[in-house]
Structure formats: structure tokens, C-alpha cells
Amino acid sequence: MEFIRPATVKDVSRIAEIIVTNYRVNFYPFFNNASFYFGELNVMDMASEYMENHNLLKSCFVYDDGVVKGIIRVCGDECEKLYVEPQFQNQGIGAKLLEFAIQKLHVSYLWALEYNTRGIAFYKRNGFELTGEKMMEDDWIPLLKMRLTDK
């Protein structure tokens, strides 16, 4: 798929920027924890995590049309992360990353934050449905399982 490629060490800072920005924009409003989202969570630490854990980087693919605008991280048949830089959202980049992961990496399910209605709607538009399964991450973050439909 055009513009999608495996992530490399050179992408680590952009991957970290995209993830941190999305956490702040999408999750801070729900959890309202400024000390975490604007203190503990930072690009330097996130980039270091990806540099030190090669499995994280190996499982990432980026959308790069000259600028890295989005990332998807896949483990087995699970989509673990999918984020697009907010300035480039609503341009089909997330859908292209997800389509790539479904077609090339055989992604069939994911866990979505229960409060993230925008994200859940995006996944539904792209062929996923809620399964009814719910889990708590870190004992306080409610996640809902979504599975790819047979279409």
C-alpha cells in the first residue's frame, strides 16, 4: 500500500510525538490527570522506550508520504495502537493504515477505550464490531473488544 512501510529507528521521535500528542488530545479529557499527561508522559521517554524495546519498533508501520503522519502497531492479529497526527486526521490515513494491517498483517481484533466514542465509530466504519467483552487495563481503564466482521 502506497506510503505505508515498516518503522525504522529514524522514525522513533515521530512515533513518540504522534502517540504522546494523541494521548493528550484524546485521553486527557476523560482522565483529567495533568501530572501524568503533561508531566510523566513525554516524547523523550516514549522515544527511549521504542529505542530500547526493539520488538515495539518491529511491530510498527508508519504512513509516510514524505512526513510520517500516522502509525499502527500490531502484535499477532491484534491492532495494539493506531494513531494519526491530529493535524492530518480525517484524510483517510487511519483507514489506510487499518486496511493495510487487515490485508497484510491479518489483524482481526483490537481493544478500544470505552470512552473513546469517536475511535469506536471509526473502527465500526472500517469493519469492526463490539464483541461485548470488556477488560480493565491497570485496574481502572475500561477497554472494549472489537472484532473484524466477516463482511
What are these regions (language model features)?
Residues F3-E17:
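A short beta-loop-alpha structural element at the N-terminal edge
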Residues V20-Y50:
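Conserved GNAT-fold acetyl-CoA-binding loop/helix
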Residues V68-G70, G94, G132:
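A structural microfeature
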Residues W111-L113, E129-K145:
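Conserved catalytic-core motifs of GNAT/GCN5-like acyltransferases
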Residues V62, G66-Y83:
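Conserved beta-strand in the GNAT
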Residues V84, N90-Q103, A121, R125:
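Conserved acetyl-CoA-binding loop-helix of GNAT-fold acetyltransferases
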Residues Q103-Y115:
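Conserved GNAT acetyl-CoA-binding A-motif
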